[in-house]
Regions:
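Non-heme Fe(II) oxygenase catalytic core, chiefly the N-lobe of the double-stranded beta-helix
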Residues: 111-147, 152, 157-161
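Short beta-strand-to-turn element immediately C-terminal to the catalytic PLP-Schiff-base lysine
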Residues: 6, 16-18, 90, 112, ...
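Structural signature of FAD isoalloxazine-binding scaffolds in flavoprotein oxidoreductases
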Residues: 95-112, 127, 262-273
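Short catalytic-site patches enriched in acidic/histidine residues
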Residues: 103-119, 139-140, 180-189, 248-252
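Catalytic-pocket segment enriched in acidic/His residues
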Residues: 8-10, 87, 93, 163-285
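A generic local secondary-structure boundary/capping motif
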Residues: 4, 67-69, 89-92, 116-125, ...
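N-terminal non-catalytic cap/leader segment that marks the start of a structured domain
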Residues: 1-99, 268
């Protein structure tokens, strides 16, 4: 199944991809609206049941509505840095033996099609194409062998980073949380439609049509199951939490000269079977 969170005339809604290839859905003020993805996941409601209800709704043209982040308010945004060996090397870091974790805040999130904003404070706006794993079943001390059972689906993220602010201190939080820099979308694809852990899928990032990142999901140092198992040793995971699983080599920071995103650019992140996350770049007003 594929779900799209959207808004029309200021009212939020949810749509599902139909068997015919179109989209059908309901606005939250319509009779029978099953709830947002956050609500469905937090309540443990069946996405199959929600999909059946939405499929009986009205046709939705995703090009004519405003897409929202797949989840506008994830419970936790758990990001993994230095998770591709080539990226660690190009960034000047020794490959860590344990996942490098940091967090994002919901206030940084934007949707497919929304502009990534380059702040007035810095020109060092960098792209980072990444796979997102969405938690559908919570837990603590989750065994790696069962970790993927806790993933309801996958999406795409552009972890756009303000590099000079990222490295002002040993903690990366500031440079990873500027407003309107975390693009998340375009849709949620449920796990049953994809290979386990998205192994075998390719990630490609393009800036103005030119490929700047290209890697297989298999190239991760710590795969999705490992990330879930290790993080859940310390933190209870809840439905609606997301893992932003790391970016491959090719980032602008590592290029000579550096390649920063600027006003008027278009950045795309594509992952096989998940679609394309596309965002324009604009300067902060």
């Amino acid at each position: 199944m594929r779900f799209a969170s959207f808004a029309e005339k200021g009212v939020n809604g949810l749509a599902v991809r139909t068997k015919a290839g179109g989209w059908s859905g309901l606005l939250e003020n319509a009779d029978g609206f099953p709830g947002s993805l956050e609500t469905l996941l937090s309540r443990g409601n069946s996405l199959n049941d929600a999909a059946a209800i939405l499929a009986r709704g009205k046709p939705v043209d995703l090009d004519q509505v405003t897409l929202l982040p797949v989840l506008s308010n994830p419970g936790k945004i758990i990001c993994v840095g230095l998770n591709y060996a080539d990226h660690s090397a190009e960034s000047g870091f020794k490959q860590p033996d344990y996942p490098t974790l940091f967090g994002r805040f919901n206030s940084s999130l934007i949707a497919h099609g929304a502009p990534i904003v380059r702040p007035k404070l810095s020109e060092q706006l960098d792209y980072e194409g990444e796979l997102v794993a969405v938690i559908g079943k919570g837990g603590r001390n989750i065994p790696k062998a069962r970790a993927l059972d806790h993933v309801v689906g996958y999406s795409i993220f552009n972890d756009a980073s303000i590099r000079d602010y990222q490295f002002k201190s040993p903690q990366w939080t500031m440079g990873k949380n500027f407003d309107d820099t975390g693009a998340f979308g375009p849709t949620l694809v449920t796990s049953d439609e994809l290979p386990p852990g998205c192994f075998g899928l390719k990630l490609v990032t393009r800036l103005n049509g030119q490929v700047v990142q290209s890697a297989m999901i298999d190239d991760m140092v710590f795969d999705v199951a490992t990330q879930i198992a290790l993080v859940s040793e310390a933190i209870t995971l809840s439905p609606g939490d997301i893992f932003v699983t790391g970016t491959p080599s090719g980032v602008g920071l590592a290029r000579k000269p550096p390649l920063w995103m600027k006003h008027g650019d278009i950045c795309e992140v594509e992952i096989d079977q998940l679609g394309i996350l596309r965002n324009p770049i604009v300067d902060q007003k």
